[in-house]
Amino acid sequence: MRALKVAVAGALACALCAEASPLVLAERGKAPSCSVVVEKGAGPTGAYAAEELVMFVRESTGVTLPVDSWAWPWRKTVRIALDESLGDGFRLETGWRTYRITGGRRGVLYGVYETVERFGDIIFFGDIRTHVPKKDAFVVPDRFRDAQQPAFLGRSTTWKEVRTNIVSRTRLRFNLHRRGTVVEPKFGPEEIKYVKEFGDCHTFRDLVPPDEYFAKHPEYFSYLNGIRRKDKSQLCLTNPDVLDIVAKKCIAALDADPSANAVGVSQNDRRNQCQCETCAAIDKVEGSSSGTMFRFVNAVAERVKETHPDKWVQTLAYQYTREPPKLTKPADNVLTYLCVIEADLARPLTTSTCPASVKIRELVDRWTALTPNLVIWAYSTNYRELLHTFPDVPTLQDNIRFYRDRGIRRLFIEGGGYHSHLGEFKTYLISKWLWNPDVPYEELERKFTDAYYGKAAPQAREYLKMYREYCAKCQSKMRWSCWVVDTPEKEYFPDEFIDKAMKIWIEDALAAVKDESEDVRYAVEMAGLEPLVMKFDRWCETTPRVWVSRHPETFAVPKDAARLYKELDGRFRKALKRGRDIGIGNERALWQWPRRNWKALGELKRPAKGSDRAEATCRVVDTESTSRGDVVKDGEAAGGEAMRIANSSSEVGVYFRMANVAFDAEGVYRLRARVKVEKTSPNAKGEAFWMKLGEKEVRVNVEDVAADGYQWYDLYEGKLSRDWVFRIGCGNFARGGGVKAVKDLRFDRLEFMRCE
């Protein structure tokens, strides 16, 4: 017994002497000398935190730490404990042979991730991969102390890298989850989790479906211009039956999904708010349509609170509801998302003199004066050009700081799809700055590029330096909202920038990673998508596809199109093999349509002889049209296919640039279109369709359509301009209770004929 006491005393003395030494949790090639202890009450998140720590230490050092419920006092331990008062926060501290990770039900996980990031140099990128460098030992410094709380209580982004992957979302410390995300208890409770039945925005159509209610109750829907609207409508928010329907559906949805803590009650994604006498009177008193909206949402929230006092009713301050009401305040269980979609993303909100950004600063101040439960819905992508360069990275940090300093507690930043403009990098930056907006950009850029691009990190930083220089130039040119169209005339990022970016990514960076892992090579290849797409889109806007010139040799065609198309197409195919839908998943607009466009350029050949007649078929036009039209099989069309134009009032179905036509400047041309109009009835009245070229406009009424089937309609005769655009769309119908005059409208081709 005396010998045992001496041995124990000796061991304790040695330990005390070594107290000032770093705590080695694992050493490569040695048996584990440290245990992970999950303390009582840590729950499923504590157990999962231990699993994550063990996994990352093993991947880093090759050593698997045992997980125990207790350990001898002299054994080295990592202790994981729950303190619910910390919420998302955590405390990290080293003691005598002990490293403690204490956090709230999410914070305990975040404490583990902070540990492996800080001491294991591990970097989380999203659902593509995690960077885990190999180490000889996993070491925690002696006398280490750290306590953290996030800058924002709620943090989220919809960049595709983390949109639906709960593991990645948790590792990057995002905690606002959207509809359809399944969250197990081990990930901790979500800050906001919406019911499965409805989403978190634009829910009116789901709550009161027009197909279910309009026929018998048109009074439930917007009153506009003397009629109740079924399509492209909102709800009549002063109708008591609408309130009953919505409140009951919200309560039922919360009953059916006990894990949810929020239900969305918000306008459809358009304007057309109800202008009936009662709604209009409230809007006038409140100074905004938000008055009617928030009176309605508050009434729903009051009923929800009776059965679900701890649940949120979420709504939007967006478009026609973004102006705060003068009299009504959101109820204490209403969560208001202020959508700042109009912001100029190229200039910091704090200093921008752009009227849209000045207005947003004002709106943030006015809304925060009304409610502490304001969530900012911000944006970090360009929906008109998802795969083009966008100048928002230099302003991201400043804008996040702006919201932090204004007292915003929850921030959601909407993003794009896989491999959209710097999506992987922006996901990483957003995750770090929503937690701590003061982390220096340079530190994050270095960590990300070293880990993500491997040996191509110098080239990546060269590109980012050049990108930021051009972004500074963008600030003096225009307002960069999330709906900006790039054209050669505007050249927001000039051809010089695109050519330099192509050299960096397609030549220099690829050469640097030829011996790297497949993941690193893939990352570099996908970075090259952006300049390739921009190059092809610029070419597409200026390269002839229709030849009606007597001198075709005078028109330039891209020399490298065929070679570069192979580069571009190869990247798309590799992305699809990995299950990456490029862009935001709009299959026609972001996969079939651009690739047809780019492929046509890759196969383009200049005709050997001149011509006085040519046709722009629906397929040629489709490369430039908007998503309002779809190419369909049509036996009556000359080529067996036609463009079916969406049957919506006044919307453009076909858009075709004269810059894509090789014509002679001195020539006089006659243009006509082959179109088919299918009436809703023989006696239908109203405008069937319209066509426009330059200043010339032709409108055709339904009653003037003489026969069924395709007919030729004259459009223009004279000289042409490369600046002109041919457009065709459905007309402004005599709706008569919402019934359209045209059942179907199809475009076959546009004919060009030289007259002299």
Residues covered by each model-derived region:
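Structured mid-domain segments that build the active-site/substrate or prosthetic-cofactor binding neighborhood
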Residues: 241-244, 252, 355-458, 462, ...
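Extracellular carbohydrate recognition and processing domains
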Residues: 693-725
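Short, well-ordered secondary-structure micro-motifs within conserved domains or adaptor modules
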Residues: 66-88
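Extra-cytoplasmic beta-strand recognition segments
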Residues: 655-682, 711-718, 750
